[in-house]
A protein has these predicted regions:
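Acidic, metal-coordinating catalytic segment for phosphate/diphosphate chemistry
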Residues: 1-18
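Nudix hydrolase/Nudix homology domain
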Residues: 4, 37, 80-149
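A generic structural micro-feature
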Residues: 9-13, 40-43, 91-96
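A short coil-to-beta-strand element that immediately follows conserved catalytic motifs
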Residues: 72-82
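A residue-level structural signature of the nucleotidyltransferase/glycosyltransferase Rossmann-like core
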Residues: 11-12, 28, 43, 110, ...
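Conserved Nudix-box catalytic region and its N-terminal flanking loop in Nudix hydrolases
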Residues: 27-68
Length: 149
């Protein structure tokens, strides 16, 4: 489905998840969107995506992180942080986002990106994440910045 191809009614919402992965040294795993994406091409983000019917958000974020990065966070410290809501009546795309934060020790070689979705990745400092956000090329940062500490 292409972005902006939704047909939701004003009172309908879908659920998405985002997963912040932080190493004990304070660095974060961020991914770069494919350069051929219709929306946000080449921008930075954290792993995430839609929750499937019958799936709870924790299972969805574990699945999305594993699909996009190859990392299994099912036994990692951390978990649910908070949720936010977006209402976009013009786009007919209303959604809730559940934000998760996991603490896990991993190295570059542990990351196996999903080539259909992810252009690349970076083990970034908080300052690097904030710099991408200031440039306007880090998706959802303003809605989730409190989970980066």
């Amino acid at each position: 489905m292409k972005r902006n191809d939704w047909s939701m009614k004003p009172d309908e919402f879908h659920l998405t998840v985002l997963g912040v992965l932080k190493r004990p040294d304070g660095r974060y795993l961020i991914t770069q969107r494919k350069l051929d994406k219709e929306w946000g091409a080449g921008w930075w983000e954290v792993p995430g995506g839609g929750v499937n019917a019958g799936e709870d958000s924790r299972d969805a974020v574990i699945r999305e992180i594993r699909e996009e990065t190859g990392i299994d966070v099912s036994q990692a410290a951390g978990g649910y942080a908070f949720s936010y809501k977006r209402v976009n009546p013009e786009e007919k795309n209303n959604y809730f986002v559940d934000i998760y934060k996991f603490i896990l020790d991993f190295v570059d070689n542990d990351v196996k990106v999903q080539p259909e979705e992810v252009e690349g990745f970076k083990i970034a400092t908080l300052e690097e994440v904030q710099a991408f956000a200031k440039e306007g090329i880090f998706l959802h940062y303003d809605s989730m910045k409190e989970v980066f500490d």
